[in-house]
């Protein structure tokens, strides 16, 4: 459970064990601040589980950006829709959509754009079954980066067509598109449909199987070779800062400046 991430991370580190920790680092920045001195003193490798950095499509798009294939990024769009919401009991203790779901996208935005300065979020309550959770079940977030680039994140906890996972990066000299993955590449055209395709994959373990494998491989290689791990503790903290800013923005309707 998330409340045990920091205690277990520190316990493992004190025992001299390298750590691969699931997101988020905590449910509240106060917990991070209370443990900051201990976190800063950790000497073993600590990697955070933002697995989408290792998704082959997202990673290839990032590599193309780094290679200058589209020039400087001006706009980034991240669309993440789940087939169905988790149980209401889980949502109530998860920290909410921004800490539990969008936090991956906050890290992806930083992965592509660098540091974020402003956050605006609009939360939606679309599913009556989740009304009593006290959380949003869909959200749209706008992030303004220090570079001047803008990211738009679209999240929804229900999508009838499956696990909808897309990314678009637009630059001065071109654009990159990471599309959905399907079970097969077969397309059907006949008298009733044109270009019908397989549904999207319907579970995150299927969609991100390669990402989880490559993430674990990168962690093991870094530990064995003594090379730096990434994403870092600092990346975990930065994503939580953005999640808290988005929550505050969605509740108040105000743009929130990110504390440096």
State where each predicted segment sits.
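Active-site loop of classical SDR/Rossmann-like NAD(P)-dependent oxidoreductases
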Residues: 203-217
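Hydrophobic residues in well-ordered beta-strands that form the structural core
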Residues: 21, 46-48, 153, 178
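C-terminal helix-rich "cap/oligomerization" subdomain common to oxidoreductases
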Residues: 218-260
């Amino acid at each position: 459970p998330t409340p045990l991430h920091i205690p277990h991370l520190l316990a493992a580190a004190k025992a001299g064990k390298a750590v691969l920790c699931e997101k988020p680092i905590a449910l509240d920045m106060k917990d991070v601040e209370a443990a900051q001195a201990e976190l800063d003193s950790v000497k073993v490798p600590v990697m955070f589980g933002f697995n989408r950095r290792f998704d082959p499509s997202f990673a290839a798009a990032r590599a193309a950006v780094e290679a200058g294939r589209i020039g400087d990024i001006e706009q980034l769009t991240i669309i993440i829709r789940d087939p169905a919401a988790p149980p209401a009991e889980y949502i109530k203790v998860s920290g909410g959509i921004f800490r539990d779901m969008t936090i991956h996208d906050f890290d992806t935005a930083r992965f592509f754009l660098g540091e974020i300065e402003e956050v605006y979020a609009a939360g939606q309550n679309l599913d009556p079954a989740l009304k009593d959770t006290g959380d949003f079940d869909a959200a749209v977030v706008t992030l303004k980066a220090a570079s001047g680039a803008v990211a738009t994140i679209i999240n929804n906890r229900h999508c009838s067509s499956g696990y909808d996972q897309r990314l678009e990066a637009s630059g001065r000299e071109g654009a990159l598109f990471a599309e959905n993955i399907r079970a097969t590449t077969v397309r059907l055209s006949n008298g009733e449909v044109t270009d019908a395709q397989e549904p999207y994959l319907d579970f995150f373990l299927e969609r991100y199987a390669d990402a989880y494998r490559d993430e674990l491989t990168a962690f093991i290689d870094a530990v064995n070779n003594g090379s730096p791990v990434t994403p870092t503790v600092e990346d975990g903290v930065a994503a939580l800062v953005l999640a808290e800013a988005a929550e505050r923005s969605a509740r108040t309707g105000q743009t929130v400046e990110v504390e440096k």
